[in-house]
A protein has these predicted regions:
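Conserved acid/base catalytic micro-environments in cytosolic active-site loops
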Residues: 1-131
Length: 131
């Protein structure tokens, strides 16, 4: 899968991984990205994007929470699950495990995996969506 830094009005393609640009917030609108820069500082960046993605993509949304602080991503994972999407977190191998542990404790995670196993599971999930 390709990994690309998201940009304003970029069309979202299948089988791509998008990364939030530095010092920016990212949302989705009409199946394209909306970049808010500079960051407002008042929002949790991952939650903001995951909630927007859950609203836009419903059951086709997939959220992956890796290493990080402050439990960012937990509320977004709840929204993804509530809309029928799938959520992943890195296991205890995360260098900073606050974000994945917060999402796991909230009960909104489908898969808890080592980082190196996430791509294969993600590919199998994506393949199942095609059928």
């Amino acid at each position: 899968m390709s990994v690309t830094v998201a940009s304003e009005a970029m069309s979202i393609l299948a089988n791509h991984v998008y990364v939030i640009p530095p010092d920016s917030d990212l949302t989705m609108d009409n199946y394209s990205f909306k970049v808010i820069s500079p960051r407002s500082g008042r929002t949790k960046q991952v939650d903001l994007f995951f909630i927007s993605m859950a609203n836009e993509m419903s059951a086709r949304a997939v959220g992956i929470v890796l290493s990080g602080y402050d439990g960012d991503g937990t509320e977004g994972c709840k929204h993804i699950k509530a809309n029928g999407g799938k959520t992943f977190t890195q296991d205890m191998s995360a260098e900073v495990d606050y974000m994945p542990l917060s999402a796991q404790a909230a009960g909104c995670v489908d898969f808890v995996l080592p980082l190196n196993e996430i791509p294969d599971k993600l590919k199998s999930f994506a393949a199942a969506l095609k059928t």
